[in-house]
Amino acid sequence: MHLLKVGTWRNNTAFSWLIMFGVLWLVSQNCCRASVVWTAYMNISFHVGNHVLSELGETGVFGRSSTLKRVAGVIVPPEGKIQNACNPNTIFSRSKYSETWLALIERGGCTFTQKIKVAAEKGASGVIIYNFPGTGNQVFPMFHQAFEDVVVVMIGNLKGTEIFHLIKKGVLITAMVEVGRKHIIWMNHYLVSFVIVTTATLAYFIFYHIHRLCLARIQNRRWQRLTTDLQNAFGQLQLRVVKEGDEEINPNGDSCVICFEHYKPNDIVRILTCKHFFHKNCIDPWILSHGTCPICKCDILKVLGIQVDVENGTEPLQVLMSSELCETLSPSEEETNNEVSPAGTSDKVIHVEENPTSQNNDSQPHSVVEDVHPSP
């Protein structure tokens, strides 16, 4: 059946989708390289008069290309209102109490590499970059160019802003940065998003095609049942071969109201349940597409016990007729099983009557089949 071909096409489509997403998955594996991230233990000391307050915690994360070593010094922010250190002429007021110092720089305005380069050229042993406002204490490993013997660490915005304001108030703050724990990250957030979207899309297409396949199988079974019913139903409709001497081939005889051609000898006509008759090749597609008699509008399929869903359309029925019925109901078989004998030997004869006074069928003849009992 044609529907089986459609189902096969849908299966091929699903298989092609599976291949495509499989290739995408293999390509994505090349992006899934393990990366190492090192956290930073920071011992921050606040010198207030003769008192020193220390704070120790794993509050930072090293940059991707940072030197991994221990470093200590005074924390020094840039002078002025702009704290991003994007200007090569940025000035850092170095403390006279320590030879080593760590630059405290705000994120934004330029790349991390530019900030680190400015601080390294000014003599900083390390660079502490704090995150954007509104990010809390969120940190991430920065991508930047490698600088020899320069430690690069990111801390959260809250901690960085707190240190900056205390320094502006005259508090001397020192920090000792040590290498913390190592974390291995197998996938970045871009790859995670890609995997999630790919998996969701793949799952959708799998379930979609499974659903369509189930519907196609159900529809195939329904068409098979309908084929059998139509074969049995059309077998109930009588067929007749028009022969020489029949009234239908007289000069004043009737013509088929579907093709408007006169009946000729050896024409095969089908007699409907309403007793109207037409060319078999004309009326069969008509019944499948309209379901009614062209003259009296009698619902032929309903009379024969066939229920067809309107929403399925008429084209599938015509396809079904051409692909199934024509293979099983050949004219020779139909003539053998359903042919009505000629008028002289049968008790049923076709008569054609003109009904010129009919208002509903002004141009269409009225054909009936009457029972005729031969005289003894």
Curated annotation (Swiss-Prot):
This is E3 ubiquitin-protein ligase RNF133. It comes from Macaca fascicularis (Crab-eating macaque). Gene3D superfamilies: 3.50.30.30, Zinc/RING finger domain, C3HC4 (zinc finger). It catalyses: S-ubiquitinyl-[E2 ubiquitin-conjugating enzyme]-L-cysteine + [acceptor protein]-L-lysine = [E2 ubiquitin-conjugating enzyme]-L-cysteine + N(6)-ubiquitinyl-[acceptor protein]-L-lysine. One of its GO terms (biological process) is protein ubiquitination. Auto-ubiquitinated. Its EC number is 2.3.2.27. Residues 328-376 are annotated as: Disordered. SMART domains: RING (SM00184). A zinc finger (RING-type) spans 256-297. One of its GO terms (molecular function) is transferase activity. Interacts with E3 ligase UBE2J1. The chain crosses the membrane at residues 190-210. Residues 355-366 have a biased composition (Polar residues). The lineage of its organism: Eukaryota, Metazoa, Chordata, Craniata, Vertebrata. It is found in: Endoplasmic reticulum membrane.
